[in-house]
Amino acid sequence: MDKAFDEIIGNSHTDSSSNHKVTRYRRRDLRNELGPRLGFAPSDAASRSKDRLYREREEPPLPKRIRISKIPLDVSDYTLDDMIKEFGSPIFSKIFDNKEDRTCIYEFEDPEVLEKIVERYNGHELHNAKIEVEIYQPQRKHSRMNAHNRRKQTAQEHGRDRPGSHYRQKPNRVSKKNKGREKNNTPTSVEALDAELDAYMKG
């Protein structure tokens, strides 16, 4: 794409080294300005990030849902369906089974139904246990991923500053093999050389 822009803009500039640097800087500016006009998508990461944020802002929020939690495990799906049936048919429903209890999610076409369900069943006793009912706003998948990445990056930055962090530079260690080589490479003392010479002469 840079080559195509160079052909459009032209290369009629001075030959001096200082002017050549300025010329390339101006050509880069012109490429950035002409790119959107000629239909070329921006290639830099900053522009892509801005486009992604713009799309996220333009996307409408997901409809609110009702969440019923702390449901005893012995409560059947039929019982839960009967509880919700009086408020109409949900357009979305999902039940999660945990180790200690159950959780169900419902979405209705009429958002006013959610408030009625909260008033009716929040704190309601079901099989000797009080259930919790709340309205929540679901997030889109990419929004959750971005939030997770931000938390992960923050944790990594804090970890680099903490004493004892694995990012801290470790002292250089010499292996046993290298230590043995270092010992063998040490020069022999004068006394040892004299002793070897005497032994050679006597023998």
UniProtKB/Swiss-Prot annotation:
GO terms for cellular component: nucleus. The keyword RNA-binding applies. Involved in export of poly(A) mRNAs from the nucleus. Recruited to the coding sequences as well as poly-A sites of active genes. Belongs to the YRA1 family. Residues 1-60, 137-203 are annotated as: Disordered. It comes from the Eukaryota. Associates with mRNPs. Interacts with YRA1. The modification N-acetylmethionine is found at M1. GO terms for molecular function: DNA binding; RNA binding. Residues 139-153, 165-180 have a biased composition (Basic residues). Keywords: Acetylation, DNA-binding, mRNA transport, Nucleus, RNA-binding, Transport. It comes from Saccharomyces cerevisiae (strain YJM789). This is RNA annealing protein YRA2. Residues 64-138 form the RRM domain. Gene3D superfamilies: 3.30.70.330. Its main location: nucleus. Residues 11-20 have a biased composition (Polar residues). The keyword RNA-binding applies. One of its GO terms (biological process) is mRNA transport. Residues 47-60, 154-164 have a biased composition (Basic and acidic residues). It is found in: Nucleus.
